[in-house]
């Protein structure tokens, strides 16, 4: 009987150690703050304040581990792209013919495609195909930059969608950096 009683504390201690190791290695308990801090340490392009602000407001963030927060970043990218496409189309209503109008039309198309790229990144990360997810996030950033390029080519400076482009690129960087943290 004494032998059995002495095994219980050892078994309980072993269970605690296993639980702690699994929690740390799986990212359980990750918060936007800790994930964004780690992402910023990994990639100096990560805007910590932006990262925390955008990820903290997502409904999936409170229960997410690092993998979940990578998906949250991709989903936030989908939302930002959708808002940017809406903004481009709204500005298009008031635009006169010419370079600015053509650039707005081009940007509306690019932002629609960017939303699809972020959605594909989400799906890839969800399937744990991290390289493909990061590639799609990079594609989304490239599409956003092409919007600014459309305005530059039209001789319109600054771009009336400069903020939307900047936020799109920032969330693509965040998505990639957090995905890099997933083990």
Curated annotation (Swiss-Prot):
Induction: Induced by drought and salt stresses. InterPro entries: Invertase/methylesterase_inhib, Pectinesterase_inhib_dom. Keywords: Apoplast, Disulfide bond, Secreted, Signal. Disulfide bonds join 36-51, 107-147. Its main location: secreted. It is found in: Secreted, Extracellular space, Apoplast. Residues 1-30 form the signal peptide. Transmembrane segments: none annotated. GO terms for molecular function: pectinesterase inhibitor activity. GO terms for cellular component: apoplast. NCBIfam families: PME_inhib (TIGR01614). Belongs to the PMEI family. Pectin methylesterase (PME) inhibitor that inhibits PME in vitro. This is Pectinesterase inhibitor 8. It comes from Oryza sativa subsp. japonica (Rice).
